[in-house]
Regions:
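Class I S-adenosyl-L-methionine
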Residues: 2-164, 169-182, 200, 276-283
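Signature of N6-adenine DNA methyltransferases within the class I
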Residues: 106, 110-111, 136, 143, ...
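A generic structural signal for short, solvent-exposed coil/turn residues
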Residues: 123, 160, 188-189, 195, ...
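Short secondary-structure junction motifs
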Residues: 126, 191-193, 263
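Conserved beta-strand segments of alpha/beta enzyme cores
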Residues: 165, 193-195, 292-295
Length: 300
């Protein structure tokens, strides 16, 4: 989105009173997405539940609603909905400090594209392939997966791809919203039956069949930033890889193996320190014993 539009959105955010900055950012993005969705004729049967489901972001500020309605009306031609990433707007409105406090680091598109090319050079795409992003965040991987599959395999129905091949999990309500509305915008489809769930991939029992591909950017949550109760749960479930000062993302390899088909593939972008860290010896052994390593790319 153009920087001048970002500045205008920030002005609207700052005009809202009595709420913390992050809540105001979520609210304004919620309103912008709602206006863009309702203003487009591409969706013959609209699905208002996508917004009702996330009404907890609605601060009910009439002045802000009016300002966003005017903003989207004036700038409708400058915002191409079919290529609009709500998560990218969210990212651009947060400072580095806020991103760090939220623990949300989005993956650059060029790295996502590289990962998809590497995975699909190995794994053939057909209608039976099931792909999971276990910490889907703003939906970047899911959207890029949809775009890649639909463009390289036009014989596959677009709705079928979105509803039967793509799966996501995240612990954050707003991330789920960003993933869903982002897919709606990029698919041009209405009333999608999503397989995107709120939950903790590591500890929640989300009943799904096993996957052909598990791909994504697991959260980097250091030992000091995890609660004692949460660490106890991880110590019990993933004692082989999670101990002492291990990072939470180590557990994603272990859980990923459990949810993967026998001939499945895991592709993660992670911090590189697990390759050398003292407390990652268990993870290195786990990977060596349980996976055939195809490639490690170090972006150092």
């Amino acid at each position: 989105m153009d920087k001048s539009l970002i500045r205008e959105i920030k002005c609207i955010i700052n005009e809202i009173e009595e709420h913390d900055y992050i809540s105001k950012v979520k609210y304004v993005i919620f309103l912008i997405c709602k206006e863009l969705y309702n203003s487009k004729n591409e969706y013959p049967v609209k699905n208002p539940s996508i917004f009702k489901e996330y009404s907890n972001f609605d601060l009910k500020d009439k002045k802000a609603e009016k300002r966003i309605e005017e903003f989207t009306g004036i700038n409708e031609g400058n915002i191409k909905v079919s290529s609009f990433y709500p998560a990218s707007l969210y990212e651009s409105l947060l400072t580095g400090k806020e991103k760090k406090s939220l623990g949300q680091v989005y993956t650059p598109f060029e790295i996502i594209d590289k990962m998809l090319c590497e995975v699909f050079a190995i794994k053939k795409i057909d209608g039976s392939v099931r792909i999971l992003d276990p910490s889907c965040g703003g939906g970047y991987f899911l959207i890029e997966l949809y775009k890649y599959i639909s463009s390289t395999h036009p014989e596959l129905d677009k709705r079928y791809i979105a509803e039967n091949m793509l799966f996501g999990i995240d612990i954050d309500d707003f991330s789920i919203f960003l993933s869903k509305i982002g897919l709606i915008f990029h698919t041009g489809l209405d009333n999608i039956k999503f397989n995107i769930y709120k939950g903790d991939f590591l500890i929640d029992n989300i009943n799904m069949d096993k996957f052909d591909i598990i791909i994504g950017n697991p959260p980097y949550v250091g030992h000091k930033n995890s609660s004692a109760s949460y660490k106890r749960l991880l110590y019990e479930k993933y004692s082989g890889v999670f101990y002492d000062k291990a990072d939470v993302f180590y557990c994603f390899f272990n859980k990923g193996k459990e949810e993967l088909k026998t001939d499945g593939i895991i592709a993660f972008i992670t911090s590189r320190y697990f390759m050398e860290a003292l407390y990652a010896e268990g993870l290195r052994s786990f990977i060596k014993e349980n996976f055939n390593i195809v490639k490690i790319i170090d972006y150092k």
